[in-house]
């Protein structure tokens, strides 16, 4: 074990699944398929063995957070302020963050039937393409400087304070912020924040997004596996774009497959891999839990902070 993981407890999947014995998955295979991202690989068995124990762990953290909030209110002689339990989820492009986020949202809603569970991605806080082009940063999209961190931190601060907050909406189909569209959140019970940058803050080293989290997860995998998943996803996106002229990826559909793959490999190496190695992976030890995936997308190891 490297020094990076010295503060984590390493748990095998076999041991992890025994920590929670419920076998009812809380959703159907059809529902699971509907929330699974392109080229991801997950089944009901994964839900039972990995995600149900995780839901149970999150409940433990939520109870602890509520107890602390109550005790602090007594100490300060103030009324308890109802605020969301915020979960941050990070990891590389194409590692499966979106599938995990949507699955947790569904499972939390099924477990806490009277609670509201919302999901927001940090993609919405990217600067619009027009701004990136103006500042010659379009080729840095996804890197720390391409995010409006002030807007993102203000959003988190508002949500954490129990107030109504709005977030911009990003579309992967148009590869840009959707004009005049907002996602509004009114003091949900749970808020999941998903993005490659949720443990970063390049503008203010004294304040991290993770300061607002009650629980945090990093989705991990070997970079050469993630590259393969990225290439597979890129080809799937090209197939979808063939019949949609408005889709950003339509411009690449006329390329021969070998040229399309070469282009995707270049993007991976010069943008996504560099971003992963310099800015994303170095933040993973800020997570409370690390889910490690094997080559087949299956979670094989879990690291829980001691």
Curated annotation (Swiss-Prot):
Pfam family, one: PRK
Lineage top rank: taxon: Bacteria
NCBIfam families: panK_bact
Metabolic or biological pathway, per its Swiss-Prot or TrEMBL entry: Cofactor biosynthesis; coenzyme A biosynthesis; CoA from (R)-pantothenate: step 1/5
Record bears the keyword Transmembrane helix: no
Protein name per Swiss-Prot or TrEMBL: Pantothenate kinase
Subcellular locations according to the entry: Cytoplasm
Gene name linked to the record: coaA
Recorded GO CC terms: cytoplasm
Catalytic activity, EC: 2.7.1.33
């Amino acid at each position: 074990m490297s020094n990076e993981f010295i503060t984590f407890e390493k748990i095998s999947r076999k041991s992890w699944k025994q920590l929670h014995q419920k076998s009812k998955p809380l959703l159907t295979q059809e529902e699971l398929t509907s929330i699974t991202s392109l080229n991801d690989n997950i089944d009901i068995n994964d839900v039972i063995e990995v995600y149900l124990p995780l839901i149970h762990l999150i409940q433990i953290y939520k109870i602890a957070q509520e107890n602390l909030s109550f005790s602090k209110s007594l100490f300060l002689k103030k009324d308890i302020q109802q605020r969301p339990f915020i979960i941050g989820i990070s990891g590389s492009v194409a590692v499966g963050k979106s599938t995990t986020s949507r699955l947790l949202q569904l499972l939390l809603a099924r477990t806490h039937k009277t609670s509201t569970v919302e999901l927001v991605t940090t993609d919405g806080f990217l600067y619009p393409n027009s701004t990136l082009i103006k500042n010659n940063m379009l080729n840095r999209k996804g890197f720390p400087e391409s995010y409006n961190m002030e807007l993102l931190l203000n959003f988190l601060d508002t949500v954490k304070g129990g107030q109504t907050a709005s977030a911009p909406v990003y579309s992967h189909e148009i590869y840009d912020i959707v004009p005049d569209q907002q996602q509004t959140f009114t003091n949900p019970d749970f808020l999941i924040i998903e993005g490659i940058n949720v443990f970063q803050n390049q503008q203010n080293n004294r304040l991290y997004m993770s300061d607002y989290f009650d629980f945090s997860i990093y989705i991990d995998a070997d970079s050469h596996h993630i590259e393969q998943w990225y290439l597979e996803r890129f080809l799937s996106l090209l197939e979808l774009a063939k019949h949609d002229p408005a889709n950003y990826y339509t411009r690449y559909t006329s390329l021969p497959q070998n040229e399309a793959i070469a282009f995707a490999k270049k993007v991976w190496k010069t943008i996504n891999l560099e971003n992963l190695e310099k800015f994303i992976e170095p933040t993973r030890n800020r997570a409370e839990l690390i889910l490690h995936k094997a080559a087949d997308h299956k979670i094989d190891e879990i690291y829980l902070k001691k």
